């Protein structure tokens, strides 16, 4: 309930106007709330107010500060600055799942910037850390997508598809396998992988929908060049 949260936080600012330690924490939460609402100017203003006492908020609530700053930077499209805050958060995060999520996000941002090796390292950290098979697999798939040796990636994906641990996610694995096969110009094998993606899907959404689309595009390409 964002309106209720806003009312509570502004009330805290009024009640504790003479206690900057309390006010700074409230302002960091307000920064996050405004970022969520898309009110980025207001979010920036609250962040500046919260950090006006140099170093204090970093000592008092480092996790909250870096979270608020990273969210605002991401909302403004300032990914490089956000990476600095996210890296600090990932290093200090105590829960394995959240640490893995942060590493995965860092990997996505680095990949978007073209820093392939750094992205692979971040995805590898997410894979090692994640207690959830779905996130672990997603990190593996991103690492394989960044692997330049297509044969290695294809064999690894084929092995993943056979593992019972990833049975609920086979549709996504076969889709990634199809993309790797297409990249190495193995069209018939890619078609087989796309059909396996569809057949192994629990619902006709997500990976299965994309596999159907890719099969259709391949058929159109075949007709065009016959």
Q: What is each PLM-predicted segment?
A:
Residues 1-226:
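Acidic, polar-rich low-complexity tracts and alpha-helical solenoid repeat scaffolds
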């Amino acid at each position: 309930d964002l309106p209720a949260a806003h009312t509570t936080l502004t009330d805290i600012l009024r009640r504790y106007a003479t206690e900057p330690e309390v006010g700074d924490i409230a302002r960091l939460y307000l920064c996050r709330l405004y970022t969520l609402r898309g009110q980025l100017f207001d979010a920036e203003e609250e962040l500046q107010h919260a950090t006006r006492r140099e170093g204090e908020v970093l000592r008092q609530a480092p996790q909250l500060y870096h979270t608020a700053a990273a969210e605002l930077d991401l909302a403004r499209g300032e990914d490089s600055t956000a990476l600095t805050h996210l890296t600090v958060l990932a290093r200090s995060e105590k829960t394995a799942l959240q640490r893995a999520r942060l590493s995965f996000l860092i990997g996505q941002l680095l990949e978007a910037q073209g820093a392939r090796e750094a992205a692979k390292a971040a995805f590898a950290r997410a894979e090692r850390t994640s207690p959830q098979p779905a996130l672990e697999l997603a990190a593996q798939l991103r690492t394989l997508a960044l692997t330049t040796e297509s044969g290695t990636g294809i064999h690894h994906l084929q092995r993943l598809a056979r593992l019972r641990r990833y049975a609920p996610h086979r549709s996504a694995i076969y889709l990634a396998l199809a993309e790797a096969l297409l990249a190495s110009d193995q069209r018939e094998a890619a078609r087989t992988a796309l059909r396996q993606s569809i057949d192994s899907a629990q619902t006709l959404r997500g990976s299965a929908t994309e596999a159907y689309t890719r099969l259709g595009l391949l058929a159109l390409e075949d007709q065009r060049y016959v």
